[in-house]
């Protein structure tokens, strides 16, 4: 199988796997491309299958990652995604092997990734990572698990930052934290705002626009996290209909 690396030089001529057949999110895809190009200056690497498919890995040094974690000298996997008919063909392992090789070449102590305690949309299946030798390093409510593959036994253990342990914020109504990392998050935010305000519920969205903001965030899943009356509700980027059902149970 042929994989290609997406770089600043070729990104405008290549798809980035996200929202492949959704024309309405084209502006959000372009925003993610701009985000990726900026992160590439900070060490982000993006490999994908050389097909029109959602098969890719995206990783960068953990100290540059847009997540509230402490993991000096580790590589952080933003996303490892293999979908549809491409599952169960060894793609995830081969893409992970590229990350491992890069991390070792950089003299790092290991690799980390956030997975779900159970199978959940947009979160990796922890069982694959356990099979690949990853072990649990830290947990945060309600279902986030920080997994690590470590080859330096003297390395400090990766951990979530303390501010995410409370699982709450001091805000009323719906509050959504998000970044440009996922086109679906950027593409949906205005529709979610319109629906929420129509129902008479207070709404605010906070787009994290820097590494520093993301690392200080109260949301573990900075790509997209929904809070209601200060309590974390979900990381799932929902359709309008599904989000309306959620609102009906909350408000």
Curated annotation (Swiss-Prot):
Keywords: Acyltransferase, Transferase
Enzyme class: transferase
Stretches assigned to coiled coil: none
Alphabetized CDD domains for the sequence: NAT_SF (cd04301)
UniProt KW Acyltransferase keyword: yes
Domain (N-acetyltransferase): residue spans on this chain: 4-152
SUPFAM superfamilies cross-referenced by the UniProt entry: Acyl-CoA N-acyltransferases (Nat), Thioredoxin-like
Gene3D superfamilies membership: 3.40.630.30
EC number, UniProt record: 2.3.1.-
Top-level taxon: Bacteria
MF annotations from Gene Ontology: acyltransferase activity, transferring groups other than amino-acyl groups
Similarity comment text for this entry: Belongs to the acetyltransferase family.
Name of the featured protein: Uncharacterized N-acetyltransferase YoaP
Lineage of the organism: Bacteria, Bacillati, Bacillota, Bacilli, Bacillales
Gene: yoaP
């Amino acid at each position: 199988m042929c994989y290609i690396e997406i770089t600043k030089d070729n990104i405008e001529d290549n798809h980035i796997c996200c929202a492949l057949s959704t024309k309405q999110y084209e502006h959000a895809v372009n925003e993610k491309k701009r985000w990726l190009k900026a992160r590439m200056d900070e060490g982000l690497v993006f490999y994908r299958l050389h097909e029109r498919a959602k098969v890719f890995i995206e990783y960068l040094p953990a100290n540059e990652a847009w997540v509230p974690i402490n993991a000096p000298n580790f590589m952080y996997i933003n996303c490892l995604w293999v979908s549809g008919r491409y599952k169960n063909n060894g793609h995830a392992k081969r893409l992970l092997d590229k990350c491992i090789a890069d991390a070792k070449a950089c003299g790092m102590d290991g690799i980390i990734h956030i997975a779900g305690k159970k199978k959940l949309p947009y979160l990796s299946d922890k069982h694959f990572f356990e099979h690949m030798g990853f072990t649990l390093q830290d947990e945060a409510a309600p279902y986030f698990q920080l997994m690590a593959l470590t080859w330096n036994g003297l390395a400090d253990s990766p951990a979530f930052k303390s501010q995410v342990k409370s699982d709450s914020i001091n805000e009323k109504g719906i509050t959504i934290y998000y970044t440009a990392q996922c086109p679906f998050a950027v593409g949906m935010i205005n529709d979610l705002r319109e629906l929420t305000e129509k129902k008479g519920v207070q709404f605010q969205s906070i787009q994290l626009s820097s590494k520093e903001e993301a690392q200080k965030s109260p949301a573990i899943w900075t790509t997209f996290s929904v809070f209601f009356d200060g309590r974390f509700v979900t990381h799932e980027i929902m359709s309008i209909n599904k989000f309306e059902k959620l609102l009906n149970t909350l408000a």
